[in-house]
Amino acid sequence: MASKEINFSDSARNKLYEGIKQLSDAVKVTMGPKGRNVLIQKSYGAPTITKDGVSVAKEIELADPIANMGAQLVKEVASKTADAAGDGTTTATVLAYSIYKEGLRNITAGANPIEVKRGMDKASAAIIEELKKSSKKIGGKSDIAQVATISANSDENIGALIAEAMEKVGKDGVITVEEAKGINDELSVVEGMQFDRGYLSAYFVTNTDKMTAQLENAYVLLTDKKISNMKEILPLLEATMQSGKPLLIIAEDIEGEALTTLVVNKLRGVLNVSAVKAPGFGDRRKAMLQDIAILTGGQVISEELGKTLEAATLADLGSAARIVIDKDNTTIVDGKGKTKDVKDRIAQIKTEIENTTSDYDREKLQERLAKLSGGVAVIKVGAASEVEMKEKKDRVDDALSATKAAVDEGIVIGGGSALIRASQKVKLKLEGDEAIGYDIIKRAIKAPLAQIATNAGYDAGVVVNEVEKNSKDGFGFNATTGEYVDMFKEGIIDPLKVTRVALQNAVSVSSLLLTTEATINEIKEDKPAPAMPDMGGMGGMGGMM
């Protein structure tokens, strides 16, 4: 077992401080509308240029093991804030550093760390309550565009694209970000439900120019069975043929005789049919088949439910106004299911999202929710170079997450002013070292505004003092113009969720670090260089001299 080094009290906390300071110094330069970029060397490929706080934090590993422990814990603040709110990582990092710095000064002077932590927790909880009271519900498309624009580093084009995407697919819709082939940004919206399964045979294609199979006013057969015997589906095929409507078969698989017969009858013009595999795997496949059944007003033919293909009738089939299938995807537009059934299914999925503890399951449930409730929007980001593309894509991802957070919980004034305004309204009566914890938070809360002002080239002390002097709710500092304005009117806003989560995470980690009394780390042992191999046996070369 490797030897361990142990550090205690002030020695441990001071070394942790060094790591937290280094990480904060690297991250804070990106803050605000006039924040700078950070250039990051990669182990392979070109360096990355980014203004994304969490991307900077993730790259930091320090040589000193104790300083590195401090940096890694604050890195966790940034990551958790990004996971929960999608933005606010730089704010969380700056707050964590400021809280730890203020707290360390007081604890070194003799304050009790546990009492200080208790006061800090009470102060942050009270400030968050004031933030909630001052928040406003997000309005229409223009509010959404403003939130997205600010988070995308004042890029109005990105803000407009995100606002348009949200308008088209709704707040529960899925918006994905991809790289465009050219230099222009684009938005495309997939209407209806789309899943990633294409036709089982190219012979099902009806539009050879686009290589798609298009079915108008079609029936949909859904089963979790593998179909290989034609006799199983013959009664249904005859019934659909007599109805004169096209048919889409969605099954676990269709193979052998069954697939061959479908293709032959399609080519002869006897049947207008297409077939695809069911989306997903295992239990998720069953759930998605049920989603499609509800959307189209059909039934899933499953032996688990006591239903067989031979006994199925037209009444068991779903239907849709239009179905488009290419080699990779199937899109069902205007399913004929009952609106109430679809709404009930959406409510059920939302409940499952709230109850799940798995990020992967939550992501898959949200995809299902989007497919049922409004479709999928794809923002394609264009740029002149790969480096610019990565940086821009990061900004779009941030802006998208911030916008969703704003829709969830509402908005507060931006630019770091909301924290100061909420702090001014909190009047806690605490005693002893708890009061010190309260004062630490009240002082540290000014750090985001101070950093935004510094990055924009203004005197941080003057700016913070000016904002504190004016008690109007919307009053704040516009770092882009250097003016003091009504932030709501100017559209300088932040999602409440981003500000709230940043403060909660910063206080949580900083207060734990302040109550740390000892650190334990491995001592790196310098391994001696390997010995040179024995050169015996080369003596015969002496004659070459």
Curated annotation (Swiss-Prot):
Its main location: cytoplasm. Pfam families: Cpn60_TCP1. GO terms for molecular function: ATP binding; ATP-dependent protein folding chaperone; isomerase activity; unfolded protein binding. Keywords: ATP-binding, Chaperone, Cytoplasm, Isomerase, Nucleotide-binding. One of its GO terms (cellular component) is cytoplasm. Disulfide bonds: none annotated. HAMAP family: CH60 (MF_00600). One of its GO terms (biological process) is protein refolding. Together with its co-chaperonin GroES, plays an essential role in assisting protein folding. The GroEL-GroES system forms a nano-cage that allows encapsulation of the non-native substrate proteins and provides a physical environment optimized to promote and accelerate protein folding. This is Chaperonin GroEL. Coiled coil: none annotated. Its EC number is 5.6.1.7. It is found in: Cytoplasm. It comes from the Bacteria. It comes from Helicobacter hepaticus (strain ATCC 51449 / 3B1). The keyword Electron transport does not apply. InterPro entries: Chaperonin_Cpn60_CS, Cpn60/GroEL, Cpn60/GroEL/TCP-1, GroEL-like_apical_dom_sf, GROEL-like_equatorial_sf, TCP-1-like_intermed_sf. It catalyses: ATP + H2O + a folded polypeptide = ADP + phosphate + an unfolded polypeptide. Belongs to the chaperonin (HSP60) family. Forms a cylinder of 14 subunits composed of two heptameric rings stacked back-to-back. Interacts with the co-chaperonin GroES. ATP binds at T30, M31, G32, P33, K51, D87, G88, T89, T90, T91, G415, D494.
